[in-house]
């Protein structure tokens, strides 16, 4: 198998297969701790719109993992939200509204967590990291981070944080294995879905973990891909 890493582009030929991989990965991770109402929202249309929006976001960097030329996973890095560097205030942040697959939805976060870690503008957040379940457990997720995090260091960034569902123990184990340590928790009022005159509240417990870039690189230093995979450089397109 051939592996390459490229930037996410606003092309359906790239986004369509990636949305399908994203959906399979998210459903596998979430089915045990998401409500049926919330899981029903995450159809392919949701992931298509989310990835299309990412491809247009000038303040994020999205690196796509391609296997035999087909997008199979990605990682997204962004500047940390402003409220991470402000005193705890309990105010609503990151409000988002819209129509999705015929449903009206809203998403918001109540910012009420303590900060034991000092965060600055040299900190990035790992917004998402997903890999098609068909290709998991081969070291590919770690490989994607190994190849992209050094580029962040070259740009002058020092720290990383990541958010994940607090009940997702597999995610926590993975992140701890690459140097992240939980330092805070909060809640997302993940979606408010209005359907048939009802409002359904889907609340998620969110864990937040931190590492320095140097610590992450040191933690991943000896981690290698399964020998099943053969590494090649990207021949066409822009490498990450």
List PLM regions with ranges.
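Conserved N-terminal entry element of GNAT/NAT acetyltransferase domains
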Residues: 1-28, 32-33, 215-240
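Active-site rim helix/loop that mediates acceptor-substrate recognition in acyltransferases
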Residues: 37-62, 66, 71, 76-82
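Short hydrophobic/aromatic beta-strand element in the GNAT-like acyltransferase core
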Residues: 59-64, 74, 123, 128, ...
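Conserved acyl-donor/pantetheine-binding loop and adjacent beta-alpha core of acyl/acetyltransferases
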Residues: 81-124, 190-194
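Conserved GNAT acetyl-CoA-binding A-motif
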Residues: 122-124, 152-164
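Conserved beta-strand-loop-alpha-helix junction that forms the acyl-donor binding cleft
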Residues: 127-136, 162-172, 188-195
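Conserved acetyl-CoA-binding loop-helix of GNAT-fold acetyltransferases
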Residues: 128-131, 137-150, 177
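Conserved active-site alpha-helix within GNAT-family acetyltransferase domains
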Residues: 142, 154, 166-184, 189
């Amino acid at each position: 198998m051939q592996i390459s890493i490229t930037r996410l582009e606003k092309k359906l030929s790239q986004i369509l297969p990636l949305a399908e991989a994203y959906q399979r990965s998210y459903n596998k991770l979430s089915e045990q701790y998401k409500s049926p109402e919330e899981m029903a929202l995450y159809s392919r249309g949701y992931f298509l719109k989310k990835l299309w929006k990412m491809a247009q976001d000038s303040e994020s960097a999205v690196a796509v993992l391609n296997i035999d030329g087909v997008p199979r996973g990605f990682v997204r890095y962004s500047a940390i939200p402003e409220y991470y560097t402000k005193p705890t205030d309990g105010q609503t942040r990151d409000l988002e509204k819209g129509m999705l697959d015929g449903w009206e939805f809203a998403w918001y976060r109540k910012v009420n967590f303590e900060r034991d870690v000092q965060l600055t503008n040299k900190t990035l957040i790992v917004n998402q990291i997903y890999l098609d379940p068909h290709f998991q457990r081969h070291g590919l997720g770690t490989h994607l981070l190994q190849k992209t995090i050094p580029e962040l260091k070259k740009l002058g960034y020092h720290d990383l944080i990541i958010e994940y569902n607090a009940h997702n123990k597999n995610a926590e184990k993975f992140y701890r294995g690459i140097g992240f340590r939980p330092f805070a928790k909060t809640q997302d009022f993940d979606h408010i879905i209005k359907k048939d005159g009802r409002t359904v509240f889907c609340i998620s417990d969110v864990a937040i973990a931190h590492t320095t870039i140097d610590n992450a690189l040191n933690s991943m230093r000896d981690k290698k891909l399964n020998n099943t995979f053969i590494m090649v450089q990207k021949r066409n397109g822009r490498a990450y």
